[in-house]
Amino acid sequence: IEGIYLPDDNILFNSTRCGTSVDCWFTEVSNLFICDRSGKYMRQIGFDQVHTLHPVLLEDGRVVYTRWDYNDRGQIFPQPLFQMNFDGTGQAEYYGGNSWFPTTITQPCAIPGSRKVMAVLMGHHNPQHGKLAIIDPEAGRDENEGVMFVAPVRKPEAVRVDGYGQEGEQFQHPFALNQTDFLISYTPLGYNIGTPIEFAIYWMNIDGERELLVADSKISCNQPVLVAPRRRPFQRVNMVDYTKNTGIYYLQNIYEGRSMKGVTPGTVKKLRIVELEYRAAGVGCAYGHGKGGGGHAFSPVGVGNASWDLKKVLGEVDVEPDGSAFFEVPSRKPLYFQALDENGHVVQTMRSWSTLQPGEIQSCVGCHEHKNLSLIHI
């Protein structure tokens, strides 16, 4: 489902053929795949724990999508926007990866002539509609820093709510025509939670002026798309080398980044490399609780606050005195890292994961550094 054309004429789509199931339930997981236009050369490029949804192509050739991030986190607030290059390289946070708000960011669409996206903000345990916003990562990456409601334009409050954005008028599936006008599935009347509501297609602008285009008394109208020629997005060189089965990480300085605040340089001696192993089916449930909500881990490897997934330690690599590290890892695997001191104790752990494509070389400035941070001058 959710297929999109890529600049190199391949097709990116979402599929449950990865064969795993949701950590907190029994539903099949959907991940991102690529094939050519005839359906050949199909390969998986997202190796993600739960769903990756609603991929959209930006004008600069990047793909933005919703990714569920459950690794060592609660189950309610882990649905930020992620980004990747069209060949699957460069998978990284786009917005909200270390944030309580917005609860869920989904159904993104590119805004022509802009590096921003329009998206729907909603909760975790509610239907797939909510409030409409423009996301600007250049203004910030977390909470409400780079978020602006539209129709009308206003700044949202950063709140911590599960069923977010379900009061009043409801929005679904925006399609931006330019930086002020868009098509939208919309209902002005709202609904009572649990009661189906009917959507219609509107033209609308960011001030909230609107015109009804399509409506049906018996069924909702959703997912408008403009059928018109468009400029092919930027096509960068494909960096994937499928003759290889590894990739390389370069870390410039592990002490850079908000999560390492207060850690004395020289404390971290090694990085532990851990692979997440997902499950094909639920085998029971361990109930955990925390600030991120309850956690129903259906692949229990312990009791009480059990881990979502099995963790396989691949090894450890040295961290140099200047905080740098350079190491090779298996490609096409979900990996996360733990910073260790001289006693092998964990100083900080990564509550997400990273995946490299074959032959990919990926660099980072620090440990959970702000994504708007430039390289450190040496």
Describe each model-derived feature in a short phrase.
Residues 11-15, 63-67, 116-120, 182-185:
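Residue position within the beta-strands of beta-propeller blades
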